């Protein structure tokens, strides 16, 4: 999980979603997981 000021899709499989007001990126590649913080 990377915590970043700006979250971006890294590959085509990445999805940007909002959970409880937190922007997250979920992907089948675990290295691409990010959240905004």
From Swiss-Prot:
Example GO BP: translation
Superkingdom assignment: Bacteria
Molecular function GO labels: structural constituent of ribosome
Record's keyword terms, sorted: Ribonucleoprotein, Ribosomal protein
Segments forming a coiled coil: none
Alphabetized InterPro entries for the sequence: Ribosomal_bL36, Ribosomal_bL36_sp
CC terms in the record's Gene Ontology section: cytoplasm; ribonucleoprotein complex; ribosome
Residues that span the membrane, as ranges: none
HAMAP family per UniProt: Ribosomal_bL36
Family listed: Belongs to the bacterial ribosomal protein bL36 family.
Protein name: Large ribosomal subunit protein bL36
Species in which this protein is naturally found: Koribacter versatilis (strain Ellin345)
Species classification: Bacteria, Pseudomonadati, Acidobacteriota, Terriglobia, Terriglobales
